[in-house]
Amino acid sequence: MGSNDLINEAYDDSEVVGEERESKSAWMKRWYQLLTSPLDLQLVINEKLEMINWDAYAKSLAKPLGNFLTILFFIIRLLQDNLIKPNYYKLNVKSGAFDLSKSNKLKEFDYLWEISSSFQNNNQFYAFQSWYFVTLRFLNNLFRFTIFILLSLNLYVSCKFMFGYFKTYNLFHLKKEFNSPNLTKHNLKDLSKEYYEDIYKQSLWSMLKHFFRGSRDDGPHVNQNEDEIFFQLRKWIPTNFMINLFVSFSPTAIVFLSFSDVSFTSAIAIVFHQYILDYIITKRFQRSVDDDLILSSAALQEYEDKHIMARINQCSNIDTLSSAMGTRSKTPRIFTTHSLCGEEIREVYNYEKREFEALPKMTESVPGSRETRIKDYGGISQVSDHQSHPIGFHYSPRMSPYYRDKVLDNNLAQSSSNENLEKGGAYLPNQDQNRPSKSLSPLRKTPLSARQKRFEGSEFNVLNKNDINSILRSPKKKKNYHKR
């Protein structure tokens, strides 16, 4: 590679030229977009303004800005009443009203012309052309323009504060109608697209009325159900930035300064007005609203801790009754849910498999046996017929002897009844609950009258009647049954 090639590579500015062309083309595209679609620029500016957290600048920007605008308005009104108003006639007098040099009659007579010229020089008819009055005239025009800008800005801030911060809430679960002008009643059909299509078909006045007022339906709704009606709340929620700006640049102070003669003593009234308004709205009313939010949050948190979390968390329900073991947690073992079709599903948690298992469905025609009910109460998925007590059934220290004796008596009674029934051929209605299939049960092959006669003649008649009565008890009385 020669020296010329190295020099050409060192001084190769093709990349720089390409970047300059790209920058120029980008600027051309931006100017073209600005000229062809100015609304896009407006959308971008509004998006940038909405992304700013204005409430964070409420104390540092809004309040000083409002106080500065109020003081500026006071100074301008003070100068207008004490500097411009005394010289109002001299500033607004016409320059050619008493100009005798322009009179043709006086020019015809020489002595009258001399008198008129001396009279004008001695009385200074052209005093308004001096630098002092020229400056006052400029200040007068500047003050008028500034007053117009400040009044327009104050009008915009006031209208924005009072009418520009409303949020609409649709309340579908509210049943009681409150006496509030912001709460209106509507039909659920108003939320459909057909409702808006009907509005577009109406007159221009109806469309404008709906655009500015919204959909209002204050009728009695006599022929409508409560499920077809919802309430709409239009709540006024001004931002913290706008509240501080409105308080510091209030329309009451501006109106007071506009229609009164302003002097230095008027500053005392303005300072007192600013302090009282800031104290009432910002330090009292706004803090009262914040305190209400704190109380509402505390009440909601208390409800969540006591009712919602107590049902979600199994270990949060604490039994505070005095016992030998102290306080212990009560964990529900059987969980009742519903499927998408509305069917009730009863599940129990298996600690060995660490998963939920569905319990067999309980029908009204065939009640469950005592063993099945004890199994459901204890939360066990499988129980063997030859065991003295269910697997995994945990008794308390005080109630374990009672439950153990009950289960042993129940197993002995069932085993003896089964042996006797195999010999005698009688069948009881609570024998086939643990069998896999109901179609293979011999109870269905024996008529009901024969079963009843054999059951009444059995020696275990009293025992089985008590057993059936205990099984047919209400599920809500399980605790009373076990405690008895």
UniProtKB/Swiss-Prot annotation:
GO biological process, any: regulation of exit from mitosis
| Keyword S-adenosyl-L-methionine among UniProt keywords | no
Q: Where is it located? A: Nucleus membrane
Q: How does it sit in the membrane?
A: Multi-pass membrane protein
Which parts of the sequence are annotated with region: Disordered? 416-457
Where is the PTM Phosphoserine found along the chain? 3, 417, 474
Top-level lineage group: Eukaryota
- Gene Ontology CC entries for this record: nuclear membrane; nuclear periphery
Print the miscellaneous field.
Present with 606 molecules/cell in log phase SD medium.
Q: State its role.
A: Member of a perinuclear network that controls recombination at multiple loci to maintain genome stability. Required for rDNA repeat stability.
Assembly notes: Interacts with CSM1.
Q: Which family does it belong to?
A: Belongs to the NUR1 family.
The name of this protein is Nuclear rim protein 1
